[in-house]
């Protein structure tokens, strides 16, 4: 009758592959399908009505209702009637606060709106009694035939009370598709996309954040920078370059930022492009206001040593590169065996394999400098080093002659202060050694020269007055004495007069004897005779 099975329970166990008895537990396959995909939903406004309705249905007996127009029906004792068609199988189990739906292929739910109190799977405590009745299907199935009717009855009152107590602990935030409740104050969650019950037809979504999240300053917005207090800790071994204190970086320093120094002269207040000590890229000299570069442009220079464009042989980088093995002063040390090129060759300009950066034909990333060869073509001897030093000295003389020698710039403020303190220390030590420090020889000579010059001026003042304003004829003794005085003063003249005499000697030989005779004659004559000599050529001219 039951296909080789003695009872209907054995037939159902073999049909649903359940080893345990159907009276003791729910079919495992059905339970797995129900709990595999669970969706929560709730109708808050009908929650109280469902509780009272469920209590009445729990006390009532099992009911099975089959409509003639339906194809397949499964009736649950504590729930509404569920319609199943041949193409779809749907089982709906609902709790007092939520509805659990399991979706499979060709599954549709058609629940009656009148009875919304469902039977409940109580989280692995479903039922103590399960009654199943199976009717044998007819050979020719019609739309009105019934395949299965499964009735689940919960008869224990203690389990109902336990399930009701469990449902009381369920809050609205645990369920999707619900509104914000005043009771949901015990959790910190950012609920997103919760819809209002009144705006179900609309597409508007109410976005809200819990008050506790706002108080705790928890947000999902990514900050623009790092936290301000991230590096302010005692255990951090970070030193600030702005205030020289440990525990934070310069970007998080509370003190104002220092002015950036220039990379050329290390002074603050200007940058590289406004530096007065900028150098010319062609001649490598400081670019002053009167600087005129007579060198060729860098793209017209070609080195005779490495055959690269941009410099001459005396400024080739191979000069300092050849000292890679030298550890003692003297000529560079040569390697015993020449080093071969490596097999893996990459370009620093285009990042391709097979060539070096100075051989690359692609566009340069940095156009202000020309590429140089990384290899060493020759090592210098003592003779080569001496010849290069001579050329450098000769070039330095030419620069000094043209006036293009770089002037000395002011020292930075830090070095001046250090020098000032150092001088003060020296003066203290010198005061202890000798109370009256000795002056240098140069300062002593300058002082003696100044004193002698003052004496000569005093001696010359009366002589000049007598010559300019003579007081009649004087005896020969007085004239001889006066003539001797200027001779002494001429021999003891200052250094300025000596230079002037040297300039006069460099003049033509014809002008020199006339001036000398005129000076010798004028030294012995009076002012009256001198004036007569000046008037004679005027009279002769007429």
UniProtKB/Swiss-Prot annotation:
Which residue positions does Phosphoserine occur at? 142, 478, 480
Q: Where is this cross-link: Glycyl lysine isopeptide (Lys-Gly) (interchain with G-Cter in SUMO2)?
A: 129, 136, 236, 251, 336, 410, 432, 474, 485, 488, 531
Location of the protein in the cell = Nucleus, Nucleolus
Q: Where is the composition biased (Basic and acidic residues)?
A: 412-421, 436-456, 499-510, 518-528
Q: Has keyword RNA-binding? A: no
Q: Kindly state the subunit structure of this protein.
A: Component of a nucleolar TRAMP-like complex, an ATP-dependent exosome regulatory complex consisting of a helicase (MTREX), an oligadenylate polymerase (TENT4B or TENT4A), and a substrate specific RNA-binding factor (ZCCHC7 or ZCCHC8). Several TRAMP-like complexes exist with specific compositions and are associated with nuclear, or nucleolar RNA exosomes.
Q: What is this protein called?
A: Zinc finger CCHC domain-containing protein 7
Native organism: Rattus norvegicus (Rat)
**What is the phylogenetic placement of the source species in the record?**
Eukaryota, Metazoa, Chordata, Craniata, Vertebrata
């Amino acid at each position: 009758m039951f296909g080789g099975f003695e009872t209907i329970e054995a037939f159902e166990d073999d049909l649903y592959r359940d080893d345990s008895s159907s009276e003791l537990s729910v079919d495992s396959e059905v339970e797995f399908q129900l709990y595999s995909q669970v969706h929560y939903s709730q109708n808050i406004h009908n929650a109280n009505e469902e509780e009272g309705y469920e209590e009445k249905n729990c006390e009532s007996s099992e009911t099975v209702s089959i409509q003639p127009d339906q194809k397949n029906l499964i009736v649950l004792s504590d729930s509404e009637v569920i319609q199943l068609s041949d193409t779809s199988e749907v089982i709906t189990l609902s709790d007092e606060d939520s509805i659990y739906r399991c979706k499979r292929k060709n599954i549709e739910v058609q629940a009656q709106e009148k009875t919304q109190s469902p039977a409940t799977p109580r989280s692995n405590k479903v039922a103590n009694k399960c009654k199943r009745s199976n009717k044998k299907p007819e050979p020719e199935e019609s739309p009105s035939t019934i395949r299965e009717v499964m009735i689940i009855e919960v008869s224990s009152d203690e389990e109902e009370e336990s399930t009701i107590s469990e449902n009381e602990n369920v809050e609205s935030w645990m369920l999707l598709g619900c509104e914000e409740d005043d009771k949901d104050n015990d959790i910190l969650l950012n609920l997103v996309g919760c819809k209002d019950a009144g705006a179900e037809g609309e597409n508007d979504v109410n976005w809200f954040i819990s008050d506790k999240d706002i108080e705790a300053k928890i947000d999902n917005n990514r900050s623009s920078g790092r936290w301000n207090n991230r590096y302010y800790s005692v255990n951090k071994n970070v030193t600030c370059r702005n205030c020289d204190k440990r525990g934070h970086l310069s970007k998080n320093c509370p003190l104002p930022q220092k002015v950036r120094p220039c990379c050329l002269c290390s002074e603050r207040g200007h940058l590289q492009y406004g530096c007065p000590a900028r150098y010319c890229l062609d001649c490598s000299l400081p670019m002053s206001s009167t600087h005129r570069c007579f060198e060729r442009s860098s793209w017209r220079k070609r080195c005779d040593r490495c055959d690269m464009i941009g410099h001459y042989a005396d400024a080739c980088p191979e000069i300092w590169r050849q000292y890679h093995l030298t550890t003692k002063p003297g000529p560079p040390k040569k390697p015993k065996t020449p080093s071969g090129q490596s097999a893996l060759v990459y370009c620093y300009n285009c990042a391709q394999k097979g060539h070096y950066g100075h051989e690359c034909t692609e566009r340069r990333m940095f156009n202000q400098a020309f590429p140089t060869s990384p290899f060493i073509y020759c090592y210098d001897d003592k003779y080569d080093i001496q010849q290069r030093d001579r050329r450098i000295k000769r070039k330095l003389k030419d620069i000094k002659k043209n006036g293009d020698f770089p002037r000395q710039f002011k020292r930075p403020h830090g070095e001046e202060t250090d020098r000032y303190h150092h001088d003060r220390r020296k003066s203290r030590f010198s005061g202890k050694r000798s109370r009256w420090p000795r002056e240098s020889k140069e300062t002593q000579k300058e002082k003696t020269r100044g004193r002698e010059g003052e004496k000569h001026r005093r001696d010359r003042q009366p002589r000049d007055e007598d010559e300019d304003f003579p007081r009649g004829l004087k005896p020969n003794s007085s004239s001889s004495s006066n003539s001797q005085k200027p001779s002494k003063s001429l021999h003891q003249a200052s250094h300025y007069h000596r230079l002037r005499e040297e300039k006069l000697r460099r003049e033509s030989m014809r002008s020199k004897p006339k001036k000398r005779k005129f000076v010798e004659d004028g030294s012995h004559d009076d002012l009256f005779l001198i004036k007569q000599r000046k008037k004679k050529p005027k009279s002769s001219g007429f």
